[in-house]
Amino acid sequence: MTTFRELGLSDSLLQSVESMGFEEATPIQAETIPHALQGKDIIGQAQTGTGKTAAFGLPLLDKVDTHKESVQGIVIAPTRELAIQVGEELYKIGKHKRVRILPIYGGQDINRQIRALKKHPHIIVGTPGRILDHINRKTLRLQNVETVVLDEADEMLNMGFIEDIEAILTDVPETHQTLLFSATMPDPIRRIAERFMTEPQHIKVKAKEVTMPNIQQFYLEVQEKKKFDVLTRLLDIQSPELAIVFGRTKRRVDELSEALNLRGYAAEGIHGDLTQAKRMSVLRKFKEGSIEVLVATDVAARGLDISGVTHVYNFDIPQDPESYVHRIGRTGRAGKKGIAMLFVTPRESGQLKNIERTTKRKMDRMDAPTLDEALEGQQRLIAEKLQNTIENENLAYYKRIAEEMLEENDSVTVVAAALKMMTKEPDTTPIALTSEPPVVARGGGSKKRGGNGGGYRDGNRNRSRDGRGGDGRNRDRNRDGRNRDGNRDRNRDGGNRGRRGEGQGRPGSSNGRGERKHHSRKPQA
């Protein structure tokens, strides 16, 4: 293994890294940092959880001249949660060097951001829409930027941000260094690399398994209309400490979180339509344990850094295998065990195979529990806890009352009563969820999700992003945009499913009038 001291980093950064408890670099860090410190462009292919933030963050921070009062680096991330997380990580790493980091994203007061920009941050971490908004307002100037980082570029493609990224890249000096990180390399991302990067070093970290071995993965074949009852039975049997349930759309998240509360579970949902304050409030309650189930869309959960998640339930199978990897990566962290459950409807078996091919791992099948099995499962879990208490706790204070009870009742009856009191009785509250269409795998895979991102610029970007899938089908995630003050960053998942194809620009057009705009670093042939 390579230590950070062997990578040629400055003393102030080494001090920060060591104070954070890190000594050895991960493979992506060991391969990326030396090339990046030399000023080379980098294409890094690595999954989440490989340490890629430090892989680009350390050389980015190393290059910053803190005596200059100008923006010297920008990191572009697909979601506000990831922007916040990356900003926090860079702050920790750059603390001893006193690098000023500023996250900017939609949903936050733009005037507050403008005031912060006037304090001359060295590095900006933000979502594409809000960065571009500040560029257009002349509140963010990039003439001194030396390094641009594109984090999770494939996800930004899926969310329709490609044109925004191109516009940002044309606004920075041509001599800038680009560090592009992406789990996959679809053609539009390759074209970005060809146009805006110079002889990039391609670094790919291969893993025998894409997903972590300490995550137990199961799938259950369940009919759409029976999924909710199966979910509640699993929650009763498994009694997770903290659980995340993934739904495919905002409507699903809203309905599912409400239904769980009706059945007596402490649950709340997060998705793109919630205000930033509301989302942060929900996450805080989840981290504190005042809610036990977090229901989320893929995009809303991107970048979440929550420790202690024991179970992930994929209530809806994801549109693409990469999203599955990101979903289950919320559990099984820091050496702890995690459990991931995937609900598969009869027509989704092909998508299950796609996921298994991507993860290079066969999932174990689990039968959906019946009502009787759910009750018995609860009782066995309670019995285990009772046995653990018998073996490890001091019970002297409780024995006198126990002995009095045994004088009047036999021991089996007493234990049975205790089990009954601690068992959650079946709740038959009627629940009606709106059915979601199945994800049917086509052509042996599901990675093709919509070309170059399409869409409009010049004020027309706020139209619906429904139906972007190339095959004319509604993509179910519905990336409907919002206004140009950056709030469209808020709503990249779910919503308004009926407006398929509305507001679609011609492929390659950028202003709603069919005029093509080329933003290329290379001379046009």
Swiss-Prot record:
It catalyses: ATP + H2O = ADP + phosphate + H(+). One of its GO terms (cellular component) is ribosome. Residues 428-525 are annotated as: Disordered. Its EC number is 3.6.4.13. GO terms for molecular function: ATP binding; ATP hydrolysis activity; RNA binding; RNA helicase activity; RNA strand annealing activity. Keywords: ATP-binding, Cytoplasm, Helicase, Hydrolase, Nucleotide-binding, RNA-binding, Stress response. Residues 515-525 have a biased composition (Basic residues). ATP binds at residues 46-53. HAMAP family: DEAD_helicase_CshA (MF_01493). DEAD-box RNA helicase possibly involved in RNA degradation. Unwinds dsRNA in both 5'- and 3'-directions, has RNA-dependent ATPase activity. This is DEAD-box ATP-dependent RNA helicase CshA. It comes from Bacillus cereus (strain ATCC 10987 / NRS 248).
